[in-house]
Regions:
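Gly/Ser/Thr-rich phosphate-binding loop
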Residues: 295, 323-328, 337-397
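Short beta-strand->loop structural element characteristic of the AMP-binding/adenylate-forming
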Residues: 91-93, 100, 104, 108-143, ...
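Conserved AMP-binding/adenylation subdomain of ANL enzymes
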Residues: 108, 251-273, 278-324
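Conserved AMP-binding/adenylate-forming core of the ANL superfamily
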Residues: 44, 48-97, 101-104, 121-126, ...
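Structural core segment of the AMP-binding/adenylate-forming
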Residues: 112-203
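Flexible, low-complexity linker/hinge segments
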Residues: 20-30, 179-227
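Conserved adenylate-forming
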Residues: 79-84, 208-225, 230-275, 295
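A short N-terminal helical cap/helix-turn-helix that marks the beginning
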Residues: 3-7, 25-51, 70
Length: 405
């Protein structure tokens, strides 16, 4: 285990701020460079463990750091091959998949990315995609149990700037998936696409398999104000508002979180990742911060914590992967109080991070007493990249008051 390096006073934080030039928190020009650097140091280490349902937690798909950066590179090169450049936008309407990370960080490398809440109805998706003038939209290929293809393909003729519709076929995660059903999926895609003019369809999994993953096939200059991503803000009524962020924003935020929470995010960490990747917490906390730290993510199904039998198997998952930290929202932790421990060894779980909504004091105390792990509250907003303030690990009596200032 790594030595604890608690930052436990405002004075210590102020000393770090005074003595550390801001550029030390921004050691890379792009998020691609940041992930690439970590991948070179942890190439054979597991970056992602992914399973399709809670009951399949012992049969995970393992993605090493070498695989991760290779697939991100392939995806970036694929987008570039479509003619997408730095001012163009790739929108994704996807659940939590390894491919979602490839699209997210690959698009940031080649152009810019727009994360769309996959739970929104088709009309809202249409308005948001048109607002960003996305030239490519990535979504799920048709498959039983998901309505994403139906939603996105139904509005394709009304996506006025979109030239490419890209499907993610996850049947490769199911070796026993019937060939007849794959044929039905391909036929459904063919029929849908014949109805569309001026839009080309690509199968992402197939396309990137054929592309070089050793290095980017293009040169790009990243300025301080180069936009990396667009995410929708939370907590608003009506259509979500779209916030632009830069590579500089994302690298600084990830570096700062990594520095001030070294006990949580480090190369020995195993993070339970159930927050959606269309949310900044999912993308940064269970994405960029973990990757830059060389830690491992356990992706709990395409639907995250909402996935089939994830909650009923949660303590088995923690025990099996020796999870060291999990990230969730108050409703997740409230639900976990109803999941009994039945002899599982969850002693590896040291930290439970909570954000997105206030953590009720009574729930905080009840959960902290239920399991022997430290609850860490964080506050942030999409416009501020992700985490803006957090109570450092080791500070146990700051319930309801986030940070030390």
């Amino acid at each position: 285990m790594m030595e604890k390096k608690f930052i436990d006073s405002l004075q210590e934080i102020e000393e770090i701020e005074k003595s550390t030039p801001v550029e030390e928190f921004i050691p890379f020009k792009s998020t691609y460079e940041a992930i690439y650097d970590s991948a070179m140091s942890h190439s054979d280490k597991t970056a992602i463990s992914f399973f399709l349902s809670g009951d399949d937690y012992k049969n995970s798909i393992e993605v090493t750091y070498k695989d991760l950066i290779s697939n991100i590179t392939r995806t970036a090169n694929f987008f570039h091959s479509l003619g997408l450049r730095e001012d163009d936008t790739v929108a994704f309407v996807l659940p939590n998949l390894p491919e979602t990370h490839y699209v997210l960080w690959g698009a940031e490398a080649a152009c810019r990315v727009f994360a769309v809440n996959s739970l929104l109805d088709a009309e809202k998706i249409r308005e948001l995609v048109n607002a960003t003038e996305a030239k490519a939209v990535v979504t799920m290929a048709p498959i039983i149990g998901s309505d994403l293809w139906e939603k996105v393909s139904s509005i394709a003729t009304e996506l006025y700037h979109t030239r490419f519709l890209i499907g993610v076929d996850i049947t490769h995660y199911v070796p026993s998936f019937p060939e007849t059903m794959k044929a039905e999926i391909n036929e459904k895609i063919r029929v849908n696409m014949e109805l569309l003019e001026n839009i080309e369809y690509f199968d992402l999994v197939h396309e990137i398999r054929e592309i070089d993953g050793e290095q980017l096939k293009f040169d790009r200059t990243y300025q301080e104000d180069t936009v990396s991503s667009m995410f929708c803000t939370g907590g608003t009524t009506g259509l979500p508002k779209i916030a632009q962020r830069t590579h500089r924003n994302e690298i600084f935020d990830a570096s700062a979180v990594k520095t001030f929470s070294q006990e949580v995010f480090n190369s020995e960490a195993v993070i339970l990742a159930g927050v959606p990747l269309f949310h900044v917490t999912g993308a940064l906390a269970t994405g960029l911060v973990s990757f830059m730290s060389g830690g491992s993510l356990v992706m709990t199904t395409p639907s995250g914590y909402r996935g089939q039998n994830v909650f009923s198997q949660i303590w088995n998952i923690v025990e099996h992967y020796r999870v060291t930290a999990m990230i969730g929202v108050p409703t997740v932790y409230a639900h976990l109080l109803n999941i009994p421990l039945t002899g599982q060894d969850i002693s590896s779980l040291e930290y439970c991070m909570c954000g997105s909504a206030p953590f009720p004091t009574a729930l905080y105390r009840e959960f902290a007493n239920y399991i022997d792990a430290e609850v860490i509250e964080a506050y942030g907003l999409t416009e501020g990249t992700c985490i803006s303030s957090g109570t450092p690990p080791g500070i146990k009596e700051k319930i309801g008051s986030i940070g030390l200032r």
